[in-house]
């Protein structure tokens, strides 16, 4: 039976534990176990329904090394770990680092709570690095409750050859061929709650070396530690010391802040509503974003175009008349012919009104028009303003029949139906009458400016009712009786009022039903055979 040579009461980091046993074949074997990687911290996973899905393994994962030496002593013996024909497995158990005080009520659940979860057993892996030996790795160990704990590893051997059995029979509780060999304990480590857990550290070099050789070990390339401000008077002797502070500083340097937008003048995305559009104070009429501003623009102010002559003999008054800007010029509508007016020097000026009163042709009713000039047509476009030639460089031709006829055609507009208007239109002129010349000093005078232009509105003409087609009602076509029917009576149909529909006693007369439901008769022609 194996007897432990020395079991220290308080094992330290990288503590070596050895035992010696003699087999039935008189072989002297030495078992040496070393904890190469001690656990430092863990996060409590609790015991609720989410305990299994939200587990945090012990960090770093514990790693235990096993060597088997054959010889009179360890120093003089030979390492036969790879040549020894047996199976080994290591079982981990969790214990409190300090004994707990017993309470008044002792229950089995309180005495032995299930505080260790995960995979507590590990088989031996034969690795070449860091040295040729057998290694036990525990990458999936979790603790349910916070506190200070230690791990105890128990080594069990399954002997395959009879010469390697013990001299004395082993414990009867174990199956035949399975023997308990030795145990070793780790250093105390802390288990934190979810709020106090400082985070996981970067994987150690030993974990990376073991993982490179095919063992299932989780490797973390970055630091996952939570940076917390140290409170005065709050110290933990088992916090890890300098390694903790160094990793927290590295983690603090790597943390970054979400960068702000590079363009501070960028405009946010447009809303789907029409009222939230970003408009400038003066927008172009041709670029309206929606139906909010789709009303037609107001009519432009009237333009007074002087009729220049080649001799330039008209007097424009004193120098103060220069303060009036040149009126805006508008292009004529498509389809309308515009001809220049007669020269201003051929007619005598009038003082009452710039327009002479004439009879309206083609049945137009005479209407009293005030001296104010009518407004031009509002349907103009900005892109046509500059296409019209300047009146200062235009020489009008002499008045003729063609010019007056074209002017009459422009004003009469017989091809358009009458529509209600908001502003008065120019009076139509007869082909045989002409307008007197306009005097500029009467239109533009610094002493008596023109009165404001006001639109004249009149009652809209009543349009005749439009006959809208539709289906006739059933009552207007088919006569129905509302009296009750008894004893098998049926509704009287006027189409079947006679005994034989379409026939009459008179052979020269026939009856038929019209589309509106009325019964009509027709006379047939009489043909006699001679």
From Swiss-Prot:
<feature type="short sequence motif" description="Nuclear localization signal">
    <location>
        <begin position="40"/>
        <end position="45"/>
    </location>
</feature>
<feature type="domain" description="Velvet">
    <location>
        <begin position="26"/>
        <end position="220"/>
    </location>
</feature>
<feature type="compositionally biased region" description="Basic and acidic residues">
    <location>
        <begin position="380"/>
        <end position="389"/>
    </location>
</feature>
<protein>
    <recommendedName>
        <fullName>Developmental and secondary metabolism regulator VEL1</fullName>
    </recommendedName>
</protein>
<dbReference type="InterPro" id="IPR037525">
    <property type="entry name" value="Velvet_dom"/>
</dbReference>
<dbReference type="GO" id="GO:0005737">
    <property type="term" value="C:cytoplasm"/>
</dbReference>
<feature type="compositionally biased region" description="Basic and acidic residues">
    <location>
        <begin position="244"/>
        <end position="253"/>
    </location>
</feature>
<feature type="compositionally biased region" description="Pro residues">
    <location>
        <begin position="415"/>
        <end position="426"/>
    </location>
</feature>
<keyword id="KW-0749">Sporulation</keyword>
<keyword id="KW-0539">Nucleus</keyword>
<feature type="compositionally biased region" description="Polar residues">
    <location>
        <begin position="347"/>
        <end position="356"/>
    </location>
</feature>
<comment type="similarity">
    <text>Belongs to the velvet family. VeA subfamily.</text>
</comment>
<keyword id="KW-0963">Cytoplasm</keyword>
<keyword id="KW-0804">Transcription</keyword>
<comment type="subunit">
    <text>Component of the heterotrimeric velvet complex composed of LAE1, VEL1 and VEL2; VEL1 acting as a bridging protein between LAE1 and VEL2. Interacts with LAE1.</text>
</comment>
<feature type="region of interest" description="PEST">
    <location>
        <begin position="429"/>
        <end position="460"/>
    </location>
</feature>
<feature type="compositionally biased region" description="Polar residues">
    <location>
        <begin position="478"/>
        <end position="490"/>
    </location>
</feature>
<feature type="compositionally biased region" description="Low complexity">
    <location>
        <begin position="390"/>
        <end position="404"/>
    </location>
</feature>
<keyword id="KW-0805">Transcription regulation</keyword>
<dbReference type="InterPro" id="IPR038491">
    <property type="entry name" value="Velvet_dom_sf"/>
</dbReference>
<comment type="function">
    <text>Component of the velvet transcription factor complex that controls sexual/asexual developmental ratio in response to light, promoting sexual development in the darkness while stimulating asexual sporulation under illumination. The velvet complex hat acts as a global regulator for secondary metabolite gene expression. Controls positively the expression of the gibberellins, fumonisins and fusarin C gene clusters. Controls the expression of the fusaric acid gene cluster. Controls negatively the expression of the bikaverin gene cluster. Regulates the expression of laeA.</text>
</comment>
<dbReference type="GO" id="GO:0005634">
    <property type="term" value="C:nucleus"/>
</dbReference>
<feature type="region of interest" description="Disordered">
    <location>
        <begin position="206"/>
        <end position="516"/>
    </location>
</feature>
<dbReference type="Pfam" id="PF11754">
    <property type="entry name" value="Velvet"/>
</dbReference>
<dbReference type="InterPro" id="IPR021740">
    <property type="entry name" value="Velvet"/>
</dbReference>
<feature type="compositionally biased region" description="Pro residues">
    <location>
        <begin position="295"/>
        <end position="305"/>
    </location>
</feature>
<dbReference type="GO" id="GO:0030435">
    <property type="term" value="P:sporulation resulting in formation of a cellular spore"/>
</dbReference>
